[in-house]
Amino acid sequence: MSLFGLSLGRLLEALRCLPGVGPKSAQRMAFHLLESDREGGRHLAQALLEALDKMTHCQTCRILSETDLCSLCADSRRDRGQLCVVEMPSDVQAIEQATSYSGRYFVLMGHLSPLDGVGPEALGMDLLAKRLDTDQIREVILATNLTVEGEATAYYISELAQTRGITTTRIAHGVPLGGELEFIDSNTLSHAFQSRRHL
């Protein structure tokens, strides 16, 4: 039981469900909302309830959406021939904010991880395969994370695409813009050398 009562204890426990929020962070957030910004706390609670009630997944790309077809999939100006495959909805937002990419997306909602029981069916690979078969896609851009699981997922998807004669590309990775080689870790530098291209 919390020193300050059951309701605060439940709030602290609820806040800890967020990624990266431990006991101290949860306590700091809870005390801030209760001591300094109760109106903000009410607004947060209302916005969270509304999002939980209204948000679903787009039937085509699986991004979070309030409708069955998200605004990206409904936009006829986007290139239907390019399909960028990402792990999470936040990846779509990052790409949209940082690039001029104008194709379509497919969100896996994770990555292959057999040890954790996450196989192709959990990632919607059947829906992805259907899109590859029916959507006249000419290029699949693999933008999964550069982890062992992300690489395995990218390989699996590249096999799906290549058996259908669809060009598969992988986003570049390596030395960041403005990065100095002496400060780059060896794995990143190794990938950068392997992924070098002609100028």
Curated annotation (Swiss-Prot):
Keywords: DNA damage, DNA recombination, DNA repair, Metal-binding, Zinc, Zinc-finger. PROSITE patterns: RECR, TOPRIM. Transmembrane segments: none annotated. InterPro entries: DNA_Rcmb_RecR, Rcmb_RecR, Rcmb_RecR_Znf, TOPRIM_dom, TOPRIM_RecR. Signal peptide: none annotated. SMART domains: TOPRIM. Residues 81-176 form the Toprim domain. GO terms for biological process: DNA recombination; DNA repair. It holds the Pfam family RecR_C. PANTHER family: RECOMBINATION PROTEIN RECR. May play a role in DNA repair. It seems to be involved in an RecBC-independent recombinational process of DNA repair. It may act with RecF and RecO. NCBIfam families: recR. This is Recombination protein RecR. It comes from Nitrosococcus oceani (strain ATCC 19707 / BCRC 17464 / JCM 30415 / NCIMB 11848 / C-107).
